[in-house]
Amino acid sequence: MSVDVAIIMGSQSDWETMRHAAHTLEALGISFDARIVSAHRTPDRLVAFAKGAKAEGFKVIIAGAGGAAHLPGMAAAMTPLPVFGVPVQSKALSGQDSLLSIVQMPAGIPVGTLAIGRAGAVNAALLAAAVLALYDEALAARLDEWRKAQTESVAERPSNEA
């Protein structure tokens, strides 16, 4: 059986952010495989992964990277699959460098770019779920339930509790 979503990241330290995508996919019952694929330190691994991702059965790629953040764009350049880029917060510029690197792709090589950090990772997983749900009614129902539960979890009034 193939795995629907690939979560790739440039280094182990990126997992602190990208695990939020994994947890969201798990909550929705979506299969995924998380891998470290550095555009700079393991370029051959990146090429092999990106060129083979569709044949491996992946349907969507979520790519997280910090700093120069070339991973999402380079993956998108080598695969026909949709790639969602998650800028990982960096120490030097708080992830703004990552965001600009991922979002400024040339015409013809799209990367769906999300917010910096945890919110971006969660939203990348939700976008992947929405794409997959176009062809999976059971997943569409789970995604609807997830959104309903999120809505119901928001209090109507502020609380004095910490």
Swiss-Prot record:
Substrate binds at residues 11, 14, 41. InterPro entries: PurE_ClassI, PurE_dom, PurE_prokaryotes. One of its GO terms (molecular function) is 5-(carboxyamino)imidazole ribonucleotide mutase activity. Pathway: Purine metabolism; IMP biosynthesis via de novo pathway; 5-amino-1-(5-phospho-D-ribosyl)imidazole-4-carboxylate from 5-amino-1-(5-phospho-D-ribosyl)imidazole (N5-CAIR route): step 2/2. The keyword Isomerase applies. Pfam families: AIRC (PF00731). Signal peptide: none annotated. Keywords: Isomerase, Purine biosynthesis. Its EC number is 5.4.99.18. It catalyses: 5-carboxyamino-1-(5-phospho-D-ribosyl)imidazole + H(+) = 5-amino-1-(5-phospho-D-ribosyl)imidazole-4-carboxylate. One of its GO terms (biological process) is 'de novo' IMP biosynthetic process. PANTHER family: PHOSPHORIBOSYLAMINOIMIDAZOLE CARBOXYLASE (PTHR23046:SF2), PHOSPHORIBOSYLAMINOIMIDAZOLE CARBOXYLASE CATALYTIC SUBUNIT (PTHR23046). Belongs to the AIR carboxylase family. Class I subfamily. HAMAP family: PurE_classI. Catalyzes the conversion of N5-carboxyaminoimidazole ribonucleotide (N5-CAIR) to 4-carboxy-5-aminoimidazole ribonucleotide (CAIR). This is N5-carboxyaminoimidazole ribonucleotide mutase. The gene is purE.
